[in-house]
Amino acid sequence: QIGYGAKIGAGLFIGHRGTVIVNGEARLGSNVNLSPGVVIGQENRGRRAGVPKIGNRVWLGSNAVVVGNIRIGNDVLIAPNSYVNFDVPDHSIVIGNPARVIHRENATAGYCHNLVDESVPDEEYSVTAGGER
């Protein structure tokens, strides 16, 4: 279920059959890969009220949950069953619940499929390690 109004870049890949939920106000960059059970949703109150903005070349494993007014940088791998409600810098692997971040250049190498050249500029989604946007 991808909500009407979601902004999605070129090269979206949904691997295998299964439920995928994307909030209608979410923004996804180019070459994002979604696995079964992924939820990209909103937080309704608090300092993170809102929906995620997800960068280019992001792979989300099965049952990963990404919620709130947060930014996921470029070249990020979110491991299966991870719960993410904070900004994630470029070139990172996110794992666990609660999630933790591991810096890794080429984090999505070998994971992202259906790559296309027509991508949104990385600067549009970049997040530095200090959380600056």
Question: Which residues are covered by each model-predicted region?
Answer:
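Terminal amphipathic alpha-helical/low-complexity segments used for targeting or macromolecular assembly
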Residues: T108-R133
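Structural signal for interior beta-strand "rungs" in well-ordered beta-sheet cores
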Residues: Q1-I95, A99-I102, A107
